[in-house]
C-alpha cells in the first residue's frame, strides 16, 4: 500500500474535497516540511510537504528575485562609480534600483534618518555572491546579503513562514506518481493566518538490526562480514502514535504477522534496495530513528557503497531529479553535522538528506530536552517520560536467532525492531517536538531543518532582520555578515552581596527577583544599535535639543568604554528595534498564557472519553508550543546581543545591559536597607530579604507567654511566614514604584515567588530551605534547593543521600528552648552513620557516570580507557571471543562505572606503592558486579562526599582565613574539608590500620638508614687510609681493590675477568706508558661493574666479620624497636631481608663508585704526578656524601 492509498483510506472526505479543488485549480493549503534550493543557473526554491488530506506535494517557486543592497552616498556619481566597479570585475547584473533605508548601526536624527541604498539584481546566486565579496572587501556596507541560505531571505522578504500552512493560488499543477507537483511565483503564495486544519504529514520511524560473526563486538559497516539483516519501518500521522502501516524487511525467514508486512530478501544488497523501494512508496515527510544519525544512516550508506548501489538507493528515495554518485556524496550525504545539545556539549550527526524527507534523530532531540541526563539510551528516555518500555532482547540471542534462521524466533526479532521504531514516534509526540520546532520556525522565518540542526543564535538574528526590514519597524537595513574587530573579554560583572552563611531558624527569608532582567533592561533603556550615540559631542548636541539619553560606561580590556542610548520616554515611535521586538513577543506570550490557562481549566472539566477531549488536548499543545517558542526567543535575545560573532553585536550595548543590571540591583538594595529590611544575599537579578524584627514582636510575645510546646512553636513559625508574605507583597509594590520613578517606564519590575523558612546559605548561588508559596508548608521532604551539588550530573546516589539527610535534618523545626545542634554537629552525625554503618549502602549507591571525550584532558577517564584498551588487546591475544564488556563508548557518550578497592602496598621506606589514581580504580559496572569487586567507599567519601559536607560548615569561625587572604570562601572550604578528612580517618577502622602500617614501615626504615650511614662512614675511612699513600696512587688503587675482593669473598674469587684485570693493574704499576692500557681497563671495569655487583649481591650470606657484625646490629635494632613500641603490625621476614640486602649492596657500591671516580682523575692527568691527598680525600667525602640509600631505586 502506497501513500496515496493510505491517505484515501484514512481521510476519504478531505481527500474528495482536495481532489475537487485540484480539478478546478482552486486555492489549496500546503504544509512545508523540507526545503531545497537550486543554486546554479536561475534560482529556484523547492518546498516539500503535504496537502491538508496528506497527499505528498512539491511546490516549485520560480521567478524569485535575486538581489542584495549596498549603501552609497547621496549623489548620482556614486551610482555610476558602483557600475564601473562591477564592470571592472566582470560581474554581471540585471538592473539597479535606488531605495532609502535606515542603517542599523548608530543613531540618526529625523532629517537624516534614512540613507540611500542601491538594490542590485542578478540572474544567479553565483554572480550575487561574487559581488557581495568584492564590495565588502572595498569597504562598502551591504544589506540583505545572506550568502549561505538564500531561502531565509526569501522567507523574510515575503513574510512567508516556512513551517506553517501556506495557501497556493494561481498554480500550475502536474500529478506525477505519488507526488503532486505545483509551480508558482512568489505572488501566488499567501501565509495562512489561522491555525489551519489538522496536519496530515507522514512520519516514518525505522530501526535496523546488524550482525557480526565476531561475537561480543559492535558490527562495523566497514567490515565485509558485518551486515544489516533487518530493517523495520512504521509510518504515522505527524501528531499520532497510531501506526498507519508497518513493514519488516529481513534476510532470514520470518514468520508472518498481521501487524506488519514481511519482505524476505536473499542478500544484503536486495534488502537495501527493498528499503529504498518501500521508502519511495510511502514518501514520508520526516524520517526518524533513535541514534540513527550516528549508526543507522552511516551503516546503510557504507553498505550501499560497498554493493555499488548508493546512487540507485538515493534516486529511488529522492523526489528530486536523478543525481550522480559524486553529487550525492558531496551535496546530500551529510557526513559531519555538529548539533548543539547544550551550551557545553555538541554531538556529530551523519545522515542521508534526500529531497522531500527531513531526517530527525530522536536521541538528539531527547538529549536537548534532558541535557543533564545520566543515561541517554532509548530505555532511559522512555522511563523518564513514563512511556511503555522497549522489548528486552539481548544482542547475543538476536544473533543466535539470525544464525539459526528460526522463523519463529526471527518474528521475535522483528517485533523487537518494530517496537523500537514505535517508541521513537511515542517520544516525539509526548514531547510535542515537531510543533515546538515549527513555532520557532514561524517566529524566525527559518526552515524546520534549521530549527532542528542549528543553535538558537542564528534564528534570533534572522527574526530580528525579519522585523527590521518592514515599514512598521522602521525599514532598517541589516547585514548578515559580522564586521569589525571582534574583541574577547569580560563585561561588567553582576552586583553580588556575599551571603550571610549558615542556618537561619528564627526569621523567614524572601527572594525578590527581577522578572526577565536583561530583556526588561533593553525595553526600559531603549538598548538598540540604531539608538546608539558614540561621541560625547553628539550626545551633548542631542540633549541640547531636548532628547533624553541613557549613559553607559564600563571597563573592558583595561580601557573605558562609554556611550549613550536615546531613550524612548514611552513614546512608541521613539522605540528602537530591540525594545519593539521584545514588547511584541511579550504581548503575544501574555495573550497565549491567558489562553493556555483557559484551555487547561477546560481540560480539567472534560473526561478523556469525551468526543472533544482530543481536539482540546491538541489545541492546548499547540498554544503551549507557541508560548514556549516566544519564551525561548526572549531568553536568547541578550545572548545574541552579546555575541561578538553576530552582525548585530555592539560592545557598548552588551556591556551597557550588564552594567545597568548592576545599577538597578544596587538601587533596590539601598532602598530596602533604608526601609529597615535585612539582606541575606544578593546576586545579578535577585535579593534575599529578611523583615524587621518588629514585624514579629506580637506573635513572638504570644509564644513566650504560652506553654512553649512544639505545637505552639509550629504556630509561631506559621504566623511568621504569613506576616512575611504580607510584608513582602507591600514591599514589592513599593520597589516597583521606586523603579518606575527612576527609569520612567514600567518594564523593569520585581516579584517575589516564595518565602524560605528555615533556610541555609552555604555560598554564592548555593542555598536550600523550605519554600512557602501560597500557604505555609513545613514539609522537609520537599526542599527548595539551589546550587547544592547533590543533583549534579555524574553524582552518585551516595552523595545525594548523605547531602539530603543533612539538609532534611537541619530543616527540622526546633524550639529555642531545645538543643539546636549546630550544622557542623549534624554533618558529623550523618557522616559517622554513613562511614561506620557500611552495610546500609547498596552497589547502586556508588554508580557514577562520565562522558568519553577523547579530545578532552580528563586524566581519570583517559587512564581508564587506556586500561580497557589494554584489557581488550590482552583478551584478543589469548583468543577470547567476547570483549564487548570492555568496549570504548562513542565519543561524547556517557558510561557508568564504580571505584573499586585495590590492595594496600608499601615500599620498604613506608611509602604507599598501590595506586591512588582514580583512573586505575575505575571499573565498568557490569564487570564489577560480575566479579563482585569490593567498592572503595573511603574514596567516595573523601573525593565526593566531604566537599559537599564542607560546604555546609565552612562558615564556622575555626575555618575562617586571616585578613590578607583574597579568596576567603575557597580558603574556608579547603580548611573545612581537611577537618572532615581527619574526622573520617578517626572513625574509619580500615583507614586507621593503613596509617599505622605506614608508620611502622617508615620508622623501621629510618633506624636501618641510620645504621647504614654509620657503616658507610667506617668503610669510607678504610679507603681514605689506603689512599693516604700518595707516592704511588696506582698501587694504592690496586691494594684497595684487592682488599675489597679479599674482604668480601675470602673463599672464592669473584670472577676470572676481574682477577685478570687486577693482575694487569699490578704488572703495569711502574710503566709510564701504561695510560692507554689503563683506559682499556677502565672501559672493561664499566662493562664488568654489573657482574661484580651481581656476584657480590648473590653471595650476600657469605660476607663475614664486618658485614656479619652490621647484620646482627641491624637485626637487634629492629627487634628492640618493635618490642619497645609493642605494635600490632609485624615487619615480615621479606621486609627484613630486603633491608639487609640494601645494607650489603650499598657498602659494595660505595667502593666501586669511589674507584671509578679516581680512575677518572688519574686518566685526566697530563703527567705522572699523583693527585694531592687533599683532592683525593675531598673526592671520597663528596662521593660518600652524595649516596642516598633507596630501596625502591635499586630493587626495581
UniProtKB/Swiss-Prot annotation:
Record-level Gene Ontology MF annotations: DNA binding; DNA-directed DNA polymerase activity; nucleotide binding
Pfam families given in the database record: DNA_pol_B, DNA_pol_B_exo1
Signal peptide start-end: none
E.C. code: 2.7.7.7
GO BP annotation list: DNA-templated DNA replication; viral DNA genome replication
Phosphoprotein listed as a keyword: no
Induction of synthesis: Expressed in the early phase of the viral replicative cycle.
Alphabetical UniProt keywords: DNA replication, DNA-binding, DNA-directed DNA polymerase, Nucleotidyltransferase, Transferase, Viral DNA replication
Catalytic activity line of the entry: DNA(n) + a 2'-deoxyribonucleoside 5'-triphosphate = DNA(n+1) + diphosphate
Family to which the UniProt record says this protein belongs: Belongs to the DNA polymerase type-B family.
Note, other: Consistent with its intracellular location, ASFV encodes its own replicative DNA polymerase and three base excision repair enzymes: a class II AP endonuclease, the repair polymerase Pol X, and an ATP-dependent DNA ligase.
Xref: PANTHER family: DNA POLYMERASE CATALYTIC SUBUNIT, DNA POLYMERASE DELTA CATALYTIC SUBUNIT
Role according to the record: DNA-directed DNA polymerase involved in viral DNA replication.
Name under which the protein is recorded: DNA polymerase beta
